[in-house]
UniProtKB/Swiss-Prot annotation:
Similarity comment: family membership: Belongs to the UPF0728 family.
Biological source species: Homo sapiens (Human)
A Pfam family that the UniProt record links to this protein: UPF0728
UniProt cross-references to PANTHER family, sorted A to Z: UPF0728 PROTEIN C10ORF53
UniProt name for this protein: UPF0728 protein C10orf53
Length: 93
């Protein structure tokens, strides 16, 4: 996938640290940072599926995981799921 691709990051609500179930973006920060470093435009899109993160490129889901498996905050460089997502975007056609 060329640089400057549009990546839609779809995410569902989850419960964090006793807070009510809502659409939180704390765990998406590293993923957004890793994709931005590669030059991609990331568009956040809320979905209703609980605990879900999906990356879409060209209207195709190319990566998905449980949002609770992503590291909280940070730059995403040490999060293995962020690296898997980055590679999935690079391999998208």
């Amino acid at each position: 996938m060329p640089k400057n691709a549009v990546v839609i990051l779809r995410y569902g609500p989850y419960s964090a640290a006793g807070l009510p179930v809502e659409h939180h973006t704390f765990r998406l920060q590293g993923l957004q940072a890793v994709l931005a470093i590669d030059g991609h435009e990331v568009i956040l899109e809320k979905i209703e599926d609980w605990n879900v993160v999906e990356l879409m490129v060209n209207e195709e889901v190319i990566f998905h995981c449980n949002i609770k498996d992503l590291e909280f905050g940070g730059d995403g460089k040490l999060d293995p799921l962020c690296e898997k997502a980055r590679i999935a975007v690079l391999n998208a056609y």
